[in-house]
Amino acid sequence: FACKTANGTAIPIGGGSANVYVNLAPVVNVGQNLVVDLSTQIFCHNDYPETITDYVTLQRGSAYGGVLSNFSGTVKYNGSSYPFPTTSETPRVVYNSRTDKPWPVALYLTPVSSAGGVAIKAGSLIAVLILRQTNNYNSDDFQFVWNIYANNDVVVPTGGCDVSARDVTVTLPDYRGSVPIPLTVYCAKSQNLGYYLSGTHADAGNSIFTNTASFSPAQGVGVQLTRNGTIIPANNTVSLGAVGTSAVSLGLTANYARTGGQVTAGNVQSIIGVTFVYQ
């Protein structure tokens, strides 16, 4: 019995360990978010199918790692779901052919927020999976340890909803101009959702965000966000109503706003956070 990864890294007869680099493309699902489907990444075969039947399980102790180490979820093994990190060994899958067959493992996260996410950098460890191989012929009992690494920078959604982008940069035109902010949200199932803004503000009404430009900043001006013409103060929840699988726009527009005193020419920049909440 031996295994290999999609890029050709092999663990030979007798077991061992290998690193698996996967391109993460997480998907928000109802009740669980797909992190990675490893059936497209790890393949195994039986070297002596005429005389031996190999049995393969996912062993107790498999878990998320790195920035995901504090999260839990489920693992789908051969079509059935089990808690992850694994607290017991899964039922076995039979390997009885020399032809490489996918190892049927997919990892999911349990949502813990509305539309949160965890940023993962390329090269980061995300999980350690322990494949156990036995057979019906002798006392062979080998471990194949797979260290799963991200091959790309990605944000893994940790909520039941997700946004079109985690970072949105818009460029305001000249003073008194405005620009729409292209930000949408969708959910795996319909649920009432709202959001609020956060950031450093320059006025008593908490509605004008401070100009934080470090190079040649303009004076007397900040940035204000509106929705359908209505000013949105920081920390005031805006209701979006029921949000389902079709993306819903937040309807935000960025505008200049006077903070007092004389307006002088220069650069204007503000960083404004958007936090989603279930309602």
Predicted regions, residues:
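Mature extracellular/passenger domains of Gram-negative fimbrial/pilin and adhesin proteins
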Residues: F1-Q279
